[in-house]
Every structure is written in C-alpha cells, then in structure tokens.
Amino acid sequence: MVAFATEKKQDLNLLSKIASGDGHGENSSYFDGWKAYEENPFHPIDRPDGVIQMGLAENQLCGDLMRKWVLKHPEASICTSEGVNQFSDIAIFQDYHGLPEFRQAVAKFMEKTRNNKVKFDPDRIVMSGGATGAHETVAFCLANPGDGFLVPTPYYPGFDRDLRWRTGVNLVPVTCHSSNGFKITVEALEAAYENARKSNIPVKGLLVTNPSNPLGTTLDRECLKSLVNFTNDKGIHLIADEIYAATTFGQSEFISVAEVIEEIEDCNRDLIHIVYSLSKDMGLPGLRVGIVYSYNDRVVQIARKMSSFGLVSSQTQHLIAKMLSDEEFVDEFIRESKLRLAARHAEITTGLDGLGIGWLKAKAGLFLWMDLRNLLKTATFDSETELWRVIVHQVKLNVSPGGSFHCHEPGWFRVCFANMDHKTMETALERIRVFTSQLEEETKPMAATTMMAKKKKKCWQSNLRLSFSDTRRFDDGFFSPHSPVPPSPLVRAQT
C-alpha cells in the first residue's frame, strides 16, 4: 500500500500543477450526480429503475424542428452530394477570425434574440469552442493569476473550471439572498468588493449570468444599469453571460446589457463584454459554438489570437451560417421553443405545486430553483448533502444541490426540465409524488408524539429505501418522532 502511494506521488510529480491539481472542480456534488446517472441511466424499457437526468441544462424540446431543417437543406453540409462542391473551399485552412458569412449570421441571430433592439458588429465577434472556451478567453484577456472576478451567488458550478482552472483567477462570491428573490444589490456588490480588497485580491471584473443559471430569473433594466454604473465607477470590467437569451417565456422579458449601455451617458464601453453560444438557445451544445463579443478593440484583437486554441470547425461554421441565415426557420424555431419551454415549465411547476413543493418564481432558462429547506435536518450544507444523496440514490433523480452552485442558503436544488421527453418528465414527477406521499404516511402516526414533544427537529435516516413497485414503502424510522407534521412535509417557498 505504501509502495502504491509512493508510486502515485511520483506519477503526479511528472505532471504539471494544473494537470494534477483539483482546479477542474469535478470533486463536487454537481459532478457526483452526473456520475450516479452515468452508472445507472434511466431508460423507460431497458432500465426503468435508473437515475433520471435532471442535472443537465440542455434544450432538447425542438430537436424535431432541427432535424426537419437539416433534411430539407442537405446543401448546408459539405458531406452530402448537394454540398460536396464546396468541400475544397471549406475544408482548407481558414482565418482565425472565422468565415464572414458565419459571423454575419451569428450577429443577426444575436440581434433577433434580443428583439432587434440592438445591433451587433460582425467584426467584433470572436468564436470559441463553446461558452466554456469563451469564458476562459475573456479571463485570460482581462485578468492575471491572483486577480478576481465578482460573481453573484448562486452561480453555475462550471465557472470554477472555466474561469479559474488554467487562468489562476479567483472568483469572489457576491452573496444574494432568497428574501428578495436572490436579486443582485449594490450593497452586496460593495461588500464583496471590500472583502476582496481585505483579502488582497485585485478585482478586475464582475461576471453576471442573464438569464440566470440556476435561478431562471432575468435582470431588469434598473438592475442592469446599476451593474454598469458600479463597474464603471470602480473601473472594472462587466462580463455578461447571455447564453440563455432566447429561453424566456410567458411574460418574461430579456434585456441585454447591449441595450442598456445605449441608455447610459458616458458609459465606458471598453469595460463591457458579452459571452454567448448556441448551446442553449438553439439546443446545439455538441457543435461547440461559443462567442466573445467585446466593445473593447484591444480585447477583440487579443481574443482573436487566443481563439486559435479553440476554433469552431469550418464545416460547423458553414452549417450554422446556412441555418441562421434562414430567417423563416429561425423565427419559427424561437417562437416554438418558447411555447414548448412554457408548456414544460407549467407541467413541472403544476406538479410541484400539487405536492406543496416550493420553487423560485421565474420565467426563463431550462430549469427551476426548487425549495426543499423545510426537509433539512438542520439548516446546514451537510444536511443538504444528506438529502441530496437520498434524492439521487433512492428517488433516482439527479438534481443539483444549491451548495454546488455556491448558494449561501442550504436547501435549494436546481431541477432541469428541458432535456427529456414528456413521458420521462411524467416518470420523474411520479417519483417525487411517491416520495412525498410516503413521507406523509410516515409522519401521520407520529403526529401525537410530535405535539406532545413540542419539538421541531427533523431527522433523515441513512437507511432510507425507496421502491417503485406496487408496494412502495419506506423503511421504518425515516422521520424522527419530533418531526413537524404540516399538511405536506414540503412547503412552498415564500419568494
């Protein structure tokens, strides 16, 4: 055993600190949930007791529209008889700037997803291998190792990888609270900025996600103006991640930072940068189309040089240029995507409402922010992790705990709803129903004891076993005799 440990240490010494370190961030419950799914993925026929993937923020609701367009336009691919005549032109080495028709089509699409209220210059578009590569490129352009970016919480766990791992940049959390719907306030920004200063971390920028992942909320005009003014006053950069721009639905409105800076007099646009991609709005994460759009000429020049490490293939550029130039298709796709997202959101929220499960009111994104604080043994992240393990390994739903999103309050979970078909969603809701109904059955006999004890303590037992057979029961001792007994053990969030 000692020899093995020594050998392993020697192997690590052969590698760089970046390669052998844990900066990737994969040692978190966010990625552990993915591992549980990969080991036992749900399939309605082959693996009906498998884990349902609700931890993947992917838009699969309009795949039929995408397939229909591809079949109708074989000339968009250089690997078909209709498009092969362009093979030689596309397959040869291309400029790092990207195909002109690709940049023009992307700029037009970005305008359309922002209700044509702003214009984007194709010459300011820098391509990258997905939003992951785009974020890292921005970090390399704006910050040195040891510098920091302010990031409002909760935020996407992948930022720890995208912005920190290879750049050496620090992420400084801006603490937001459920009491005001996790809104970003100037007071919270000032507090985080001061904390960074006390920790000797030079703050180089503020990164915000709009619409928010994981909240599904959008930033209103006044909030965006306050963010622009804050960063301008501090002389730091504002990076707006807008990759969910076209996922709003219902009465929700997306306002881009590009629109707001037009309304602010004397705004220093050199400090404004946008990260975008086609992964969420078009449901094309596998094509790895990421975009850096900067109003800073120098950043555009530097980012273009850095893009050589993560270019979008010319074949993909060619396909995307053809697709996004079809305005009739794009209009139909965006319209239908919003309708289907609204319908799926209504389906899952109606189901949760019927079970008394709370969620943060929001109308954007491919997920919702579920409130299970009332089920925690104690208001700690250890209790949150304990509950999460039950949900993943017993209920067999891979939802992501708030702690992995750096949420300040334990008990929140992100639940993705657009990456599955209708029947799988029904199965997921049924599992939640079974879960909650059995909790009620377990707590009812304990009501008298609970009233006499007059205690409000909850207790998760590690020996919980769920069954989705007709018997459907829990092991004895799931709740302690001191558990409170509301009409449902889950309560709606007051947000």
UniProtKB/Swiss-Prot annotation:
**What keywords are annotated for this sequence in UniProt?**
Ethylene biosynthesis, Fruit ripening, Lyase, Phosphoprotein, Plant defense, Pyridoxal phosphate, S-adenosyl-L-methionine
What terms describe the molecular function in GO for this protein? 1-aminocyclopropane-1-carboxylate synthase activity; identical protein binding; pyridoxal phosphate binding
Which coenzymes or cofactors are required? Answer: pyridoxal 5'-phosphate
Modified positions (Phosphoserine) in chain numbering: 480, 483, 488
Key word Phosphoprotein present: yes
pH and activity: Optimum pH is 7.3.
Family classification: Belongs to the class-I pyridoxal-phosphate-dependent aminotransferase family.
Q: What does this protein do?
A: 1-aminocyclopropane-1-carboxylate synthase (ACS) enzymes catalyze the conversion of S-adenosyl-L-methionine (SAM) into 1-aminocyclopropane-1-carboxylate (ACC), a direct precursor of ethylene. Involved in bacterial flagellin-induced ethylene production.
Q: What is this protein called?
A: 1-aminocyclopropane-1-carboxylate synthase 6
